[in-house]
Amino acid sequence: MRYVDVILPLPLDGTFTYSIPAGMEEKVVPGMRVLVPLGKSKKYIAMVADVHSEKPNFDCKPIDAVLDECPSLLPQQYRLWQWISSYYMSSLGDVYNAAMPSGMKSTEKFKPKMELYVELASGFRNEQALHVALSMVQRALKQSKALTTFLTLSQWDSLEGDTPREGIRKVTKEELMNEAHCTAAVVKALIDRGILFTYELEVGRLNTSGEAHLDLIKPLSMAQQDAYNQILMQMMKKNVVLLHGVTSSGKTEIYIHLIRKAIEEHKQVLYLLPEIALTVQIMERLHKVFGDRLGIYHSKYSDAERVEIWQKQLSDKPYDVILGARSAVFLPFQRLGLVIIDEEHETSFKQQDPAPRYHARSAAIMLANMYADAKVLLGTATPSMESYYNAQQGKYGLVELKTRYKDIQLPEIQVVDVKDLRHRKMMTGAYSPQLLAAVRQALKNGEQAILFQNRRGFAPMIECKVCGWVPKCKNCDVSLTLHKSINLLTCHYCGYTYPVPTECPNCGSTELMGRGIGTERIEDQIAEIFPEARIARMDLDTTRTRNAYERLISDFSSGKTNLLIGTQMISKGLDFDKVSVVGILNADSMLSYPDFRAYEHAFMMMAQVSGRAGRKGKRGLVILQTKNPTLPVIGQVVHNDYEGLFKGILEERKMFHYPPFFHLINVFLKHKHEKICQQASFELGKTLRGWFGERVLGPDKPAVSRVKTMNIRKLVIKLENGIDQMKVREYLKYAQNMMLKDPRYGALQIYYDVDPL
């Protein structure tokens, strides 16, 4: 008897053993999907991790069916799953759920997309018979038009005797109806007469049009060519290379040359981007060069599209290049040779909720290690502290590109003291006279402007002017955000909505006012100040669909809109030729965040947003509004002094035991009842301190201590580099299991965020 150990798509640790019925033994190998029973009535699609002959010491159920003829999971992918599960302290089931498209975990068989085609009946496929067909419908004008349109589209009208002059072209029913401007009833009438018939064909959901045109790749500038050569030299010695290039230095063009080299060596490339918005712009550039050798993969694609990409990657003709966001790291690669991680510093590479809370950069580096000779290139204008430190220490190769493409100057950054301007009553709401003048001039010159505010919604909150009442979420420990366009107060944590009240429920006053400012409110105010502007807003609310992203970027690129207002989405490497002015409305909101990474993240955000200004022959202008113009980080942004920031922060990190010198693990506890959550967190903290001593901080309330009715407490563990990470995880799991055995804590949830951002 043979047995399989399988992974279930459930948040459960380890694998589960089932027997293989007689007749199926030869069909099952690791990496295949099988249908298995669980409990009395449930069935799941499980992933085979191992096949063996070791009989378990319990009665195990047989698998119901084998769903694959070939493995859906490659050995390298499974090893990546194991590493993510172990390092990020999540179950294999969680990794399975995150990695595979839901269509491959559904008990319903995946249905390929079918298209209905129209064809000429065999009895009419000669010149004489066609005349008969046309005479049959000459009195029915709509049918006559539909038939002649079909004959033209399909090229049956080019008959000479019994043979068409050109090859017959397939015509879909939808195409015929559109071109002939007719209804389905007209086509059906032609079918009923026996002139036409319909048939179905499987069609891919993926855009496979376009041949590769590697000859269209632009030659590199001298600075780019030098960086390219250095990267290749570094990759001979190091598996990971960091390309530190200023904004608009032409890093993407270097990537394209590296991709071409990999393809010529018959290797595959994984190109990761932090935001789906970025894939739209980069996709257009890559598609012109690599055509149908390029595949796109991210969460805004339909599940069916993601299944088709997965299956194509397992075929004998996979994509040579995959361009995608975080989840693309899980795709199968048969001959991976190069991984490019663009904007490697971006926090959106880190998965937050649900588990596994993995970092795509770390996962991609680990994935590359599983292929012989695969290399990783990290690219950014503002490296993460960890990556730059690794490069300085010699763990990674380092290549620097310090000049912008075509010697375009870095933007002029003008720091505006809004505290002083407010005191002198010179501000117009949140806008300084310098900012308004710069935007006005840009619009007058036919140029574009970007305004950055890292908060969506109309206003962060509303408040009663009389008693100070602020509406709070009933499920979470946060105030509700005002969204004026839909006239709702919304919780950005659980999605709870509440109609905007007309009077204060606490004191009855009607004097309710918005406090703070979000992108939606800025859009309204700027429309009043610049009625001639064509304004677009880019935030989470306006980009919920793939088409919304593409439309926003396309409209701004083509000049249909000329003033873009947005959150951090607009900072992430988007290139717009006509942007001459960028306004950072409130630098202080990024700097005042209670987090040890606040200055690092604020510098990155401001430097990246500033980098959107100035393209093609004109120096850009950035208006940076702040109440604290003398802060060192403001000066570092103005002078683009990343090295100064790095040196200053590094000393603090070493002194206070933070990355890159220490690894952090956040331990979270959740429970419906606050007292139980508090008590459990103190007990767990005491247990962990017994093992790790002063490395354990807390328990404490996080900034938001209640989400979706669950109370939250947090412990932080600081682990010096070189400590046995696996031993630490064993201790943590042991402490968790012991605590959950206590009947008082049966409903307690414990989870981990490893290397939190």
Predicted regions and their residues:
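Solvent-exposed, membrane-proximal periplasmic/extracellular interface segments of envelope transport
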Residues: 38, 55-60, 64-67, 702, ...
